[in-house]
Amino acid sequence: MGKPQALKDRLFGAAVLKMSFRLRGDEQSPAFKGIYPGVLRDLELEDEAVEKYIQENRAAVEAAARGKPPV
């Protein structure tokens, strides 16, 4: 088993995944609906916490979702 991730790292990963779908307008897609709940479960996160993280760190999350270096 790998090293446990810090909460901020788990939030960042889930936020980037969600933002990548959001930027394409695919949050209602079967792919997102199939993947995202499992990611939340595996990372022991709630969607509300991910949304809060996105609001507080939007620039960095969007940059990562677009495959660009962190802001």
Where are these regions (language model features)?
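Extended serine/threonine-enriched, polar tracts that run as long, contiguous segments within proteins
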Residues: 1-32
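Short, low-complexity, polar/charged sequence segments that are solvent-exposed and flexible
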Residues: 7-10, 38-41, 53
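Positively charged, low-complexity intrinsically disordered regions
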Residues: 23-25, 42, 59, 67
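Domain-exit/linker segments immediately C-terminal to small folded modules
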Residues: 25-46
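Glycine- and charge-rich intrinsically disordered segments
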Residues: 48-71
